[in-house]
Amino acid sequence: MADSPREGKVARPPDFTQLIDLASEFVGGKILFATDDFFAPAENLLKRDNPSFKEHEYTEFGKWMDGWQTRRKRIPGHDWCVVQLGIQGVIRGFDVDTSYFTGDHAPRVSIQAANFEEDKQPEIPQREVRTGAAATPEEFEAISELKSDDWSCLVPMTELTPGNPASSHNYFPVTSQQRWSHIRLNIFPDGGIARLRVYGTGQKDWTAGDPKEPLDLVTVAYGGACVGFSNAHFGHPNNLIGVGTATSMADGWETARRLDRPPILENDENGILLVPGCEWAVFRLAHPGVITQIEIDTKYFKGNSPESCKVDGCILTTQEEEDMVRQKWDLPGHKWKPLLPVTKLKPDEMHVLDSLTPELQDVITHAKFTITPDGGVSRLRLKGFPSSICLLRPREKPMMRFSVKAGFRANL
């Protein structure tokens, strides 16, 4: 018997879904063009929130749907849209989500990609979010400047499964190591898709920009990634290095309360809590470099921020990182160089701190952020200058699983 819309076992998502969604509207992704938006506009594809369903909601054009839905095609051709990624980078995989499109999902899909430098991208007029309409001849003419018919194919024409919970996520891994800036989503011939997730890692052109301006070397927008952590009960450490400011506590890293905390808390002579444990997260920088300034934002964490924190750095080769992942980051203490000593934190506040004196600012490839005893932080920025040293090679090995509540994250 077929699963009902609310039944069925959902398969475990692939590892690449732990990476950032390069196309999300939250990081600046946007729709440049869509052939048709009759029932629901293509902009819904890029929403950060999961799709929703309103059983009795209708518009003047038909059933309200939280996704992109085109009219039933009665002319030659097929529907497609063009997405400008919010973060340019290497794509590791797609999730074409058909949630709630159970009788009108797009039956087939293909995905193409291209890379345009910012100064070489043709000017595409900003489109209006609308329903009940198709692309105008002027819009077709403008988008033709991108020559999207000739873009590289990352996903060939493939059948999609309908939007029941057990089948709504259509995952497509990508092996290309190339940097991409734009996506063309083709549906054959028409229909609906709830969300398009483009998972990958940011990749910055380090030759561009002002060399005298410090950069956030750990941000996901440039390719930074969490490669290990002790606990992520309420929020993944990758959130710490996300784009922009946090939008809520859910957009930060928060651990469970440690069970080894003493019944009665006491301070040492410096006012630091005497507690036996701590929580930590390790990050691979987007580029080896020297950290000069550290920003720690506890915004939204008002009754659950850490008491204190510290930041250490080290330099590792790819092989050494892989060894540390297997050893759950049991790295000898002498390998870590202090970037920020134990520092008291205040709740719901931005802390801007200088890294240790210049003579101690070694080039690092990895940073370890330690909080005591537990709690939540919304953002971590490690600002500095990229080094010409580059020990890391492109990653070829498959990613490894992790335990969300008390595990470690592996090679992203």
Swiss-Prot record:
It comes from Bos taurus (Bovine). GO terms for molecular function: allantoicase activity. Pfam families: Allantoicase. The function of this enzyme is unclear as allantoicase activity is not known to exist in mammals. The gene is ALLC. NCBIfam families: allantoicase (TIGR02961). InterPro entries: Allantoicase, Allantoicase_dom, Galactose-bd-like_sf. This is Probable inactive allantoicase. One of its GO terms (biological process) is allantoin catabolic process. Gene3D superfamilies: Galactose-binding domain-like. Belongs to the allantoicase family. SUPFAM superfamilies: Galactose-binding domain-like.
